[in-house]
């Protein structure tokens, strides 16, 4: 939508300066192979479907009532699955909302927060929105984080692990180095993709009072359409997030989403099976693309980050699009020759590889 300067006079000065996040494309194309937004290629647990249907058919009258503002059943399910106390769980309308509350609750400091120069592109948006000072720390030439860079004075640290979009993961030992170097600042580990092979920092929660771990049900639990995210931390940090949430929206998660997420956490076997299928497919996709001349960064996510020395990434993305395959291209410094490709089913990955082999490369 185009808005004229005259119309913008109704906007606040802060909003006029905002550079909003641009979500991944959701095109309406027939026979589209969508590998651009890291959605799970498999459906949620059948128990999730049953739970949603139960709300509709057995609890329909309850839809006239507000949902539980604390989403107690969901917090209990998460706490049980993670082997932590309910007081250590915060839930929100997707991890993006949880992250926004984290920025408001912990990062308004006099010194800049630290995050990598290549990271989840919502972080600069939140920083601008909340007026948070920032300092971007360059990844090294291998696109890895050097944790020694995060020992300098700061107003907080946020790291995506595994990194998005590079897919490279830190070890728990490296995360501990960052935590130990910042005892008086909150360190946030954004684990949207952790279930596909990385180490979760949740195991460190009881040892570090400055740690917040943020996760989502969108990727590994196939619930991107229902918007459920959560944070795990010691109770004094959770209390701050609850205060922020209840100053914005006391009912962020609806009855359907609560029921679906609870069912997902209760079906651990299905969850583990689907994660392993994605991991296995990822390794085969990496081998296939490597044989085609791609350099693929080591991935612990449900996507890969790949470049080809003989082909421009932007042109590759456009040629794939012409063949009905959408991948994510970032026209940004340092990564403008890479494609981020979501891991699909084996059949979907085979279509991608065959299209590259026969029609593009």
Curated annotation (Swiss-Prot):
EC identifiers of the protein: 2.6.1.9
GO function term, MF aspect, one: pyridoxal phosphate binding
SUPFAM superfamilies found in the cross-reference section: PLP-dependent transferases (SSF53383)
InterPro entries for the chain: Aminotransferase_I/II_large, HisP_aminotrans, HistidinolP_aminotransfase, PyrdxlP-dep_Trfase, PyrdxlP-dep_Trfase_major, PyrdxlP-dep_Trfase_small
Gene Ontology terms describing biological process: L-histidine biosynthetic process
One Pfam family this sequence matches: Aminotran_1_2
Catalytic activity entry: L-histidinol phosphate + 2-oxoglutarate = 3-(imidazol-4-yl)-2-oxopropyl phosphate + L-glutamate
EC primary class: transferase
Modified sites of kind N6-(pyridoxal phosphate)lysine: 219
Cofactor: pyridoxal 5'-phosphate
Presence of the UniProt keyword Plastid in the record: no
UniProt KW keywords: Amino-acid biosynthesis, Aminotransferase, Histidine biosynthesis, Pyridoxal phosphate, Transferase
Pathway: Amino-acid biosynthesis; L-histidine biosynthesis; L-histidine from 5-phospho-alpha-D-ribose 1-diphosphate: step 7/9
Disulfide cross-links: none
Subunit and partners: Homodimer.
Family membership: Belongs to the class-II pyridoxal-phosphate-dependent aminotransferase family. Histidinol-phosphate aminotransferase subfamily.
Protein name: Histidinol-phosphate aminotransferase
Organism, scientific name: Acinetobacter baumannii (strain AB307-0294)
């Amino acid at each position: 939508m185009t808005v004229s300067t005259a119309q913008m006079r109704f906007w606040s000065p802060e909003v006029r300066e905002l550079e909003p996040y641009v979500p991944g494309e959701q095109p309406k194309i027939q026979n589209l192979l969508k590998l651009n937004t890291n959605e799970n290629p498999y459906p949620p647990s059948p128990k999730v479907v049953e739970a949603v249907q139960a709300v509709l058919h057995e609890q329909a009258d309850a839809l006239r009532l507000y949902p539980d503002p604390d989403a107690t059943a969901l917090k209990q399910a998460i706490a049980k699955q993670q082997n932590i106390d309910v007081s250590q769980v915060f839930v929100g309308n997707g991890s993006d909302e949880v992250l926004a509350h984290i920025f408001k609750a912990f990062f308004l400091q006099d010194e800049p927060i630290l995050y990598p120069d290549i990271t989840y592109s919502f972080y600069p948006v939140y920083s601008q929105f909340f007026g948070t000072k920032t300092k971007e720390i360059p990844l090294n030439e291998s696109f890895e984080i050097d944790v020694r860079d995060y020992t300098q004075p700061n107003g907080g640290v946020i790291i995506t692990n595994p990194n998005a979009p590079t897919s490279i993961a830190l070890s728990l030992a490296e995360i501990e180095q960052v935590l130990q170097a910042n005892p008086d600042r909150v360190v946030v580990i954004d684990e949207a993709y952790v279930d596909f092979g990385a180490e979760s920092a949740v195991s460190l929660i009881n040892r570090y009072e400055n740690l917040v771990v943020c996760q989502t049900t969108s990727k590994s639990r196939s619930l991107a359409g229902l918007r459920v995210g959560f944070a795990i931390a010691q109770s004094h940090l959770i209390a701050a997030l609850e205060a922020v949430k209840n100053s914005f929206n006391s009912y962020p998660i609806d009855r359907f989403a609560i029921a679906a997420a609870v069912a997902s956490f209760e079906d651990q076997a299905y969850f583990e099976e689907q994660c392993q299928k994605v991991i296995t497919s990822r390794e085969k996709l990496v081998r296939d693309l490597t044989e085609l001349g791609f350099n693929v960064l080591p991935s612990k996510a449900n996507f890969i980050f790949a470049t080809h020395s003989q082909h421009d990434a932007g042109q590759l993305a456009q040629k794939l699009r012409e063949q009905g395959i959408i991948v994510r291209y970032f026209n940004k410094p340092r990564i403008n020759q890479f494609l981020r490709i979501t891991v699909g089913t084996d059949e979907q990955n085979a279509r991608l590889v065959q299209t590259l082999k026969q029609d593009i490369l």
